[in-house]
């Protein structure tokens, strides 16, 4: 059972109320940077294991 469209709208509305319109772009930017860093870290982590197997 996943999130329906109405659940997503409710979550977005709560986020909008908590952070306000002025702070929301900064919060989303920080979130995107964090996700990108996480993905890059996961990518780097996998390549280290491949190098260890070849030795």
Curated annotation (Swiss-Prot):
How would you describe this protein's topology in the membrane? Answer: Single-pass membrane protein
Keyword list (alphabetical) reads: Cell inner membrane, Cell membrane, Membrane, Protein transport, Translocation, Transmembrane, Transmembrane helix, Transport
Q: Where does it localize? A: Cell inner membrane
Q: Which InterPro entries match?
A: TatA/B/E, TatA/E
Q: GO:BP terms for this protein? A: protein transport by the Tat complex
Membrane-spanning parts? 1-21
A single GO cellular-component term from the record reads: TAT protein transport complex
**Quaternary context:** The Tat system comprises two distinct complexes: a TatABC complex, containing multiple copies of TatA, TatB and TatC subunits, and a separate TatA complex, containing only TatA subunits. Substrates initially bind to the TatABC complex, which probably triggers association of the separate TatA complex to form the active translocon.
**What does the sequence similarity comment in the record state about its family?**
Belongs to the TatA/E family.
* Stated role: Part of the twin-arginine translocation (Tat) system that transports large folded proteins containing a characteristic twin-arginine motif in their signal peptide across membranes. TatA could form the protein-conducting channel of the Tat system.
Name of this chain's protein: Sec-independent protein translocase protein TatA
Query: Organism, per UniProt?
Result: Rickettsia peacockii (strain Rustic)
As recorded in Swiss-Prot or TrEMBL, the protein's gene is named tatA
